Swiss-Prot record:
<feature type="binding site">
    <location>
        <position position="315"/>
    </location>
    <ligand>
        <name>Mg(2+) 1</name>
    </ligand>
</feature>
<feature type="binding site">
    <location>
        <position position="302"/>
    </location>
    <ligand>
        <name>Mg(2+) 1</name>
    </ligand>
</feature>
<dbReference type="Pfam" id="PF01820">
    <property type="entry name" value="Dala_Dala_lig_N"/>
</dbReference>
<keyword id="KW-0067">ATP-binding</keyword>
<dbReference type="InterPro" id="IPR011127">
    <property type="entry name" value="Dala_Dala_lig_N"/>
</dbReference>
<dbReference type="InterPro" id="IPR016185">
    <property type="entry name" value="PreATP-grasp_dom_sf"/>
</dbReference>
<keyword id="KW-0436">Ligase</keyword>
<dbReference type="InterPro" id="IPR013815">
    <property type="entry name" value="ATP_grasp_subdomain_1"/>
</dbReference>
<keyword id="KW-0479">Metal-binding</keyword>
<comment type="similarity">
    <text>Belongs to the D-alanine--D-alanine ligase family.</text>
</comment>
<keyword id="KW-0460">Magnesium</keyword>
<keyword id="KW-0464">Manganese</keyword>
<comment type="pathway">
    <text>Cell wall biogenesis; peptidoglycan biosynthesis.</text>
</comment>
<keyword id="KW-0573">Peptidoglycan synthesis</keyword>
<keyword id="KW-0961">Cell wall biogenesis/degradation</keyword>
<dbReference type="InterPro" id="IPR005905">
    <property type="entry name" value="D_ala_D_ala"/>
</dbReference>
<feature type="binding site">
    <location>
        <begin position="175"/>
        <end position="230"/>
    </location>
    <ligand>
        <name>ATP</name>
    </ligand>
</feature>
Amino acid sequence: MSKLRVAIIFGGKSTEHQVSLQSAKNIINELDRTKFDLCLIGINEQGQWHEYAEDNYLINSDNPSTISLSQPLRPVAIIPGSTRQQFISLTDGQPLAQIDVVFPIVHGAYGEDGTLQGLLHMIDMPYVGPNIMSSAACMDKDITKRLLDDAGLAVAPFITLMAHQLNDISYNEVVEQLGLPLFIKPANLGSSVGISKVNNEAEFNAALSMAFEYDLKVIIESAIVGREIECAVLGNEEPEVSPCGEIVLNDAFYAYNTKYIDDDGAKVVVPADLDNAISLHIRQTALKAYQVLNCLGMSRVDVFLTEDNQVIINEINTLPGFTNISMYPKLWQSTGLDYQSLITKLIELALEHHKKTAVLKTKCEL
């Protein structure tokens, strides 16, 4: 049986560029080479696409704060069509070797928001993870919250503010509605980039200014006091949910540095120390959220568990990290599903979903 050729797309013009490089490194290292050949497509911080050699694609690969792309082989682009040869070398105009499936691990803007998924959909390419709509809906915290709330799932009380509305709302009005402390977040970023905890008016104004440097839409939400619990979900029509894991913080909140730089900022506990009934309730909530947002392939569902055992959904991450400290693979490893088998399963799910969509009609038969 011939091997499938997998393109790993990583990097990106995003605040999460370095996180993507860390995730890609682990996926590349763990890919089952008895089943898959490999093509590496890196996107630099200017948004340019290049093919990279496996033995020379990263610089400072073991340092999360300085990891970067190395010297590429050649620039590449995608052209319309559906022949599996849509990745073209811009050096000589020739197609790269046939690619059968893509594993996009571009975190954040342009990779997790439906943009890259739309491009791959246009060339009829199977890809790991959710479709365009699910990606976009889960990336936008405002839309995510509205859809979950409509489905009867609890979310933190929040206000959405657009950049042009900055002068239409006051600190006192927000505090009257949401209380203190608050969190202010760019609506369309991940990895806790641009997020601030607010306890007073000066912090409120500074937090809004910073958040609007990253996005034209901002979420202001009540701070929820509770344990931070995460579940991994895997599958298409019949998804499975992992045991619960817990983030135990030493810092004020789970910020970017806490996640990826500071080894002492937080501790990951798998499985979380929870009563069986509470654990089941959290897992059922994660599954419902996954299905409400029509997710495919994988997602990590993050919730707060309050003192009185309320489960409040924080966010749904459709392309969770695969870094050394990432919760998603750790949760599945706790069930006996090792890293390599998880990656293989995700690729199989991508091919399975594409096979079902490929037979759908694309023209009207009168």
